Design a protein with these regions (language model features):
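A short beta-loop-alpha structural element at the N-terminal edge
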Residues: 10-23
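Conserved beta-strand in the GNAT
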Residues: 53, 59-68, 73-81
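A generic "binding-loop/recognition-motif" signal
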Residues: 19, 73, 116-117
Length: 152
């Protein structure tokens, strides 16, 4: 999708507890379709240190992503959400880069995502990877079979 150029500049930053309402609202846009799992405002506030948000000048939060520790050396990129009006404006890319930076800061060796959108994650250097423990955990509860990972 081509990037839109008429949007206000965005800043990716660490989330704070004050962002919990906006982050939950963004995630909720993608829950009915099954793309994302729901997150409560309490969850977002409690784990705000694991979220990054994309904020547009004058428009507030237009995207979010969550870094979830899977093991001491592996983390998962979750809850990647971009406001519909901001699709194609580079917000998702900025959030993926923000999560990668956070994962590197925390010294994770591998970052992975579970998704059906292989092309999206391949754009950012993720490759299909088998994580047997993850496959066993999610095989009965998830319709997402693609695991995409990259070394950091």
């Amino acid at each position: 999708m081509a990037e839109k150029t008429s949007k206000a500049p965005i800043t990716v930053r660490a989330a704070t507890g004050r962002d919990s309402v906006a982050v939950r609202a963004l995630i909720d846009l993608y829950v009915p379709s099954g793309v994302l799992l729901p997150r409560s405002e309490d969850f977002v506030a409690t784990y705000a240190h694991n979220f990054v948000v994309a904020e547009a000048r004058g428009e507030g939060i237009v995207g979010c992503a969550y870094l979830d520790e899977y093991s001491p050396s592996i983390a998962e990129l979750r809850s990647l959400a971009v406001a519909p009006d901001w699709q194609g404006a580079g917000v998702g890319r900025a959030l993926v880069h923000g999560i990668e930076a956070l994962a590197r800061t925390r010294e994770y060796a591998i970052l992975f995502a579970v998704s059906n959108d292989e092309a999206y994650f391949k754009r950012y250097g993720f490759e299909r990877r088998e994580i047997p423990e993850l496959d066993r955990e999610r095989s009965e509860v998830s319709r997402y079979k693609g695991v995409y990972a990259k070394e950091l």
